[in-house]
Structures are given as C-alpha cells and as structure tokens.
Design a protein with these regions (language model features):
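Substrate-binding pocket helix/loop in short-chain dehydrogenase/reductase
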Residues: 98-99, 103-108, 207
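Active-site loop immediately N-terminal to the catalytic Tyr-X3-Lys motif
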Residues: 100, 148-154, 176, 214, ...
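C-terminal substrate-recognition "lid" of short-chain dehydrogenase/reductases
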Residues: 119, 180, 215-244, 249-250
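Conserved glycine-rich cofactor-binding loop
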Residues: 24-25
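Active-site helix of classical SDR
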Residues: 122, 159, 167
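Alpha-helical segment proximal to the catalytic Tyr-Lys
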Residues: 127, 172-176, 235
Length: 251
C-alpha cells in the first residue's frame, strides 16, 4: 500500500487521538467526520450540545460542550480532553459590523474565540505532548481574511491575521519538540456561518468573480487539506498558512 492509498483509507490516523474545536458545524464537523473515517479517535468541542449529540451518534466521538470565549472553561475542556496527538483549532465566530460601528464587546469576543482560545487549547495540548515526550501536529483554521480587508469584517480580519502570526510563533517554539503547527486559510466556505455572511447575491457574485475556479469551497475540501497537514505526508511542513481559496490570492 503506498502512502496515498493509506491516506485515503481508514487507517491513516489509526491510533491517533485528535481534538477538534468548533466541531459542531461546518469545517470542524467535516474534519471530525473525515478523521474518524481515517481511523482517528476524535474528541469534539462545541458550544452546541445538540450538534455534539448528532456528531457523537454519527462517528462515536468523545464530546465536550464549552463556550471557548470563556478562558477558564476553554482551558478546563482542553485539559479534560488529554492526552491528544493532534489538534485542530477550528472554532471561530464572525460579528459583521462597519468599522466605525465596531463595538468593543464584539471585537473582544471575536478575538477571544478566534485567537485566545487557540492559544489556550494549543498550550494545553502542546504541554501534554512535551510531557509525554511525543511529537504531534496542530492546525489552526484561519482565513484569507488574514490577508485581505473585507468590508464589515474588521474584528474577523484582525483575528485571523493574529491567528496566522500566532501559528508562526507556535511553529518556531514547538518545532524543536517535534510538534508541527500550520494554518489553513480558506476562501468563503459553504458553512452555516458563511451562508449567513454571504447571503446577499450581489456580494457573493462579486466575491466569486475574484476566484479563478469560480466557486466557493466546500467544508470537506478544507477538511482534506487539514488532514494533509496533520498527517505524515506533511512531516516537513511547519509554520505555513496554506490558502484553500481557488486562486483568490493569486490575482
């Protein structure tokens, strides 16, 4: 069996325990389903207990309902999930406001979920890996919004740029311990959150016109990229922000 066959089959992540935040919907759920299908033991975090129940029925995962905007709760949930070999920091929120009307509460909550929670959960998981003397891999789910200024997305764009920067620092500091850290940066991905943000046909068509492949991403396509970065095939990939954008950033 060659590496490609193994990666596509049910054993690529056999024996690996992976923590996925924001696993209730969208990219996080698609990632949890894909990794479970490839043999991983999945631990799913989401603030929606209902979403976790349906996911648990689907893939038999361990679940923790938690609001990652709460720093203490985020740390406690991450600690309860240990030990893990792989981490996907996917949880994210978007509060759409014009810059001049962007309020402090929305800005702080966005940074808390999109950046601070990734730091906290990453600290817990990496500390456990180091204590156990094992390597691992972490993928932070960012966005092309880290590099592009989108109207109404001040807090969101700022949070994703911060997440990319955090990814690079994590890669530098954790690399010597055999822990790789990378980011994926999707274009608009057809998740419940994105479908709300891009429901205006005029806004959507303008965005599509900037994507050479002329379509938005599917959650499963982002999940497959995450799986690549987590897997042995990417064992020399560390500290990158990998666009999954149909060529948007190439223009």
């Amino acid at each position: 069996v060659n590496a490609t066959d193994s990666a596509e089959s049910g054993d690529a992540f056999s024996g690996k325990r992976v923590l996925v935040t924001g696993a209730g919907k969208g990219i996080g759920r698609a990632t949890a389903v894909l990794l479970a299908a490839r043999g991983a033991s999945v631990v799913a975090l989401s603030r929606s207990a209902d979403d976790l129940r349906t996911l648990e029925r689907a893939i038999g995962c361990e679940t923790y309902a938690v609001d990652l905007a709460d720093a203490a709760a985020a740390r406690a949930a991450a600690q309860a999930a240990q030990p893990v070999d792989l981490l996907v920091n996917n949880a994210g929120i978007a509060r759409l406001q014009p810059f001049l009307e962007c309020d402090v509460q929305a800005f702080d909550e966005t940074m808390a979920v999109n950046v601070r929670a990734a730091m906290i959960v990453g600290q817990v998981c990496a500390s456990s890996m180091i204590e156990r003397g094992v390597g691992g891999a972490i993928v932070n789910v960012s966005s092309i919004s880290a590099q592009i200024g989108f109207a109404l997305h001040a807090a969101y764009c700022a949070s994703k740029a911060a997440l990319d920067a955090l990814t690079r620092v994590m890669a530098v500091e954790l690399g010597p311990h055999g822990i790789r850290v990378n980011a994926v940066n999707p274009t608009v991905t057809l998740t419940p959150m994105a479908e709300q943000a891009w429901s205006d046909p005029a806004k959507a068509s303008q965005m599509l016109s900037r994507i050479p492949l002329n379509r938005f991403a599917q959650p499963e396509e982002v999940a497959q990229t995450i799986a690549y970065l987590l897997g042995d095939e990417a064992r020399m990939v560390n500290g990158v922000s990998l666009a999954v954008d149909g060529g948007f950033l190439a223009r």
